[in-house]
């Protein structure tokens, strides 16, 4: 590994190898001093598609600027969660303060915000963009522009950020920097020569990138003498100190002596600590215009410090809140139930704490006849659901079942009343006039060889083609309108398998459309099991019924009487499977003898089975629920 020391020599950068055990000669004290000059601050984030090397480039910046010594360095330094490190993805946006002596000889302060790349976590990206003036658009020099790159680029342009285009991984043998530089230039309207080339792995080009950020990204603008205003762009919960909020100061100064005021709730709190992160927390006592840091407001209730809120002071309160952040809307709903019913209060507490770290998670209590007490949770997508469930199980030691995910439907009855359905058990039983389902605008980027296979897949999912653009001779962008319910489960998996892993997908909500949807119930012994009910398109109802009854026949243990498993739409049965009865051999003791004796025993057994069938109840074991409701089909939504 090579690290670049910007202070050594006069004619450019000197390369230091890891074998030379020298530490970089950058003083870390001055950049932590409070009251930095706003003209010397640059706030920027790194946006890219998943796996294009954001976190590796961030690591190299930490090393080059000297805030992390070479001996303490580890890969993906800013990815602190175990899940992030295991899956190799960034889930939480992280921020860090970097000192940098630019090529003009002046010392600057850079605030880097490392953002996630996965489609489910684009709300984390939008929060980060609201705290920045510039964005480094990172593209893998071996893979080129992908769907999420474009989605995040459009987000950055909407926020009026200065774009610094960069090609990463130029050290790879498969890299094609010239080809992809032209692609980027065509999209953002610059010259191919303005696209920087770096390698996050070796450190090549990183000092030049930092100099370019200083040159291109504008300094933050704000009123240093006005009432304090700071936007909360993230928050975490600490069991000892309560809520820790990450803020970007827009006007005025926040100090530890002031009482802070949350503008959306009008609640005031004592400020316990104010500081910056570089990359560990350093208390500074104050934050002024343009600075990014943390404030500990001494709040224990997680709902008191909402992400997107504006912090001001009680001494000189601001009158207007800061804009630039919208609440994320849940796209997918699923029930989360503790396997042990006594863990319900612990699950409530865990969701409360997790919601502080995860502004997009919504939940409300619900009960199920089959699964007991639990919560109906709203998520941004299937990966988001999986990550939340995994964090609940790991960080809070809970054992959970999640029901099959579904989306929000709007049902209009014949008397013109409207019902919002987030759970199949809420589906109305009366006369339904119309049902509306949410749709999304999907953007798919893929090689031209696979256009036919992908169009066939989208049409099979009730998609409507809206547009087709050739980015180059071998890459095409397809725009489709698709029902959200069709893509949340296994669409991503099917897309990857049909394109040998080359396609990428991004989508955003696009309203709703009229649809022919029905509720399919699963009946055991004539009784509905609410946990297995699902809302599906009428054309796919039969397939769902057959697959669910077949699955349950394998999973439910045999009883002493025959158990019918049926799938029904209303009162009409559409599929049926039987679980054969276990039969005791009542003739085992009869050695020969009269046939009437045997017949008498068989008739007696038949009577018993008949009586058992009328009064017997079928208990569905916990394992059968877990297996039948497992979201394994959604797992490939993870990279």
UniProtKB/Swiss-Prot annotation:
- What GO CC annotations are associated with the protein? plasma membrane
User: tr-type G domain: from which residue to which, for each copy?
Assistant: 39-221
Q: What is its main location?
A: membrane
Q: Which residues form a coiled coil?
A: none
Enzyme Commission designation: 3.6.5.n1
> Which UniProt keywords are listed?
Cell membrane, GTP-binding, Hydrolase, Membrane, Nucleotide-binding, Protein biosynthesis
Quote the Gene3D superfamilies the UniProt record gives. 3.30.70.240, Elongation factor 4, C-terminal domain, Elongation Factor G (Translational Gtpase), domain 3, P-loop containing nucleotide triphosphate hydrolases, Translation factors
Q: Name one GO molecular function term.
A: GTP binding
What reactions does this protein catalyze? GTP + H2O = GDP + phosphate + H(+)
Q: Where in the cell is it found?
A: Cell membrane
Residues making up the signal peptide according to the UniProt record? none
Q: Which GO terms describe its biological process?
A: positive regulation of translation
Please list the residues that bind GTP. 51-56, 168-171
Its placement in the membrane is given as:
Peripheral membrane protein
InterPro entries on file: EF-4, EFG_III/V, EFG_V-like, EFTu-like_2, G_TR_CS, LepA_C_sf, LepA_CTD, LepA_IV
Q: What does this protein do?
A: Required for accurate and efficient protein synthesis under certain stress conditions. May act as a fidelity factor of the translation reaction, by catalyzing a one-codon backward translocation of tRNAs on improperly translocated ribosomes. Back-translocation proceeds from a post-translocation (POST) complex to a pre-translocation (PRE) complex, thus giving elongation factor G a second chance to translocate the tRNAs correctly. Binds to ribosomes in a GTP-dependent manner.
Family recorded in the similarity comment:
Belongs to the TRAFAC class translation factor GTPase superfamily. Classic translation factor GTPase family. LepA subfamily.
Checking NCBIfam families in the record gives:
lepA (TIGR01393), small_GTP (TIGR00231)
What is the protein name for this chain?
Elongation factor 4
The scientific name of the source species is Frankia casuarinae (strain DSM 45818 / CECT 9043 / HFP020203 / CcI3)
């Amino acid at each position: 590994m090579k690290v670049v020391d910007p202070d050594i020599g006069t004619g450019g950068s000197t390369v230091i190898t890891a074998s030379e055990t020298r530490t970089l000669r950058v003083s870390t004290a001055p950049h932590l001093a409070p009251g930095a000059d706003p003209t010397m601050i640059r706030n920027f984030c790194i946006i890219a598609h998943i796996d294009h090397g954001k976190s590796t480039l961030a690591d190299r910046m930490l090393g080059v600027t000297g805030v992390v010594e070479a001996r303490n360095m580890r890969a993906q330094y800013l990815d602190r969660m175990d899940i992030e490190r295991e899956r190799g993805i960034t889930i939480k946006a992280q921020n860090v303060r970097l000192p940098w002596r630019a090529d003009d000889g002046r010392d600057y302060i850079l605030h880097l915000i490392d953002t996630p790349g996965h489609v489910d976590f684009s709300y984390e990206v939008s929060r980060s963009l609201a705290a920045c003036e510039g964005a480094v658009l990172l593209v893998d020099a071996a893979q080129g522009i992908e769907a999420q790159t474009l989605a995040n680029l459009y987000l950055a342009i909407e926020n009026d950020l200065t774009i610094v285009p960069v090609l990463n991984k130029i050290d790879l043998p498969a890299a094609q920097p010239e080809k992809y530089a032209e692609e980027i230039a065509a999209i953002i309207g610059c010259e191919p020569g303005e696209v920087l080339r770096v390698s996050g792995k070796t450190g090549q080009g990183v000092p030049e990138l930092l100099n370019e950020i200083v040159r291109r990204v504008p300094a933050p603008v704000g009123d240093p003498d006005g009432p304090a205003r700071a936007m909360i762009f993230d928050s975490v919960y600490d069991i000892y100190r309560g809520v820790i909020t990450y803020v970007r100061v827009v006007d005025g100064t926040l100090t530890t002596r002031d009482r802070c005021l949350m503008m959306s709730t009008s609640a005031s709190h004592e400020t316990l600590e104010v500081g910056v992160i570089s990359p560990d927390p350093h208390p500074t006592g104050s934050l002024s215009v343009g600075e990014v840091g943390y404030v500990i407001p001494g709040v224990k209730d997680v709902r008191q410090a909402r992400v997107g809120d504006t912090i001001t002071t009680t001494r000189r309160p601001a009158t207007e809140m800061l804009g630039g952040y919208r609440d994320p809307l849940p796209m997918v709903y699923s029930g989360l139930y503790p396997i042990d019913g006594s863990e319900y209060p612990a699950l409530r507490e865990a969701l409360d704490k997790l919601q502080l770290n995860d502004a997009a998670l919504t939940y409300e209590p619900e009960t199920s006849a089959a699964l007991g007490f639990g919560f109906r949770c709203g998520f941004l997508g299937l990966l988001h659901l999986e990550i939340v469930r995994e964090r609940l199980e790991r960080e809070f030691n809970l054992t959970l079942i999640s029901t099959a995910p579904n989306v929000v439907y709007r049902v209009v009855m014949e008397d013109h009343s409207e019902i919002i359905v987030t759970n199949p058990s809420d589906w109305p039983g009366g006369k339904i006039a119309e049902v509306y389902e949410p749709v999304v605008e999907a953007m798919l980027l893929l090689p031209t060889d696979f256009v036919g296979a992908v169009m066939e897949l989208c049409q099979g999912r009730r998609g409507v083609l809206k547009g087709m653009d050739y980015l180059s001779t071998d890459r095409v962008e397809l725009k489709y309108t698709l029902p959200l319910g069709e893509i949340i489960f296994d669409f991503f998996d099917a897309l990857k398998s049909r394109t040998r892993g080359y396609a990428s997908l991004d989508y955003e909500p696009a309203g709703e459309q009229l649809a022919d949807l029905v509720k399919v119930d699963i009946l055991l012994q004539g009784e509905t099991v609410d946990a297995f009910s699902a809302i599906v398109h009428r054309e796919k109802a039969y397939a769902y019924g057959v697959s669910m009854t077949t699955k349950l026949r394998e999973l439910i243990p045999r009883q002493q009487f025959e158990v019918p498993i049926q799938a029904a739409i209303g009162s009409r049965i559409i599929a049926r499977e039987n679980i054969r009865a276990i039969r005791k051999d009542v003739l085992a003791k009869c050695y020969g003898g009269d046939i009437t004796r045997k017949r008498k025993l068989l008739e007696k057994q038949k009577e018993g089975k008949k009586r058992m069938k009328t009064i017997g109840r079928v208990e569905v074991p916990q394992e059968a629920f877990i297996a039948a409701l497992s979201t394994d089909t959604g797992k490939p939504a993870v990279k």
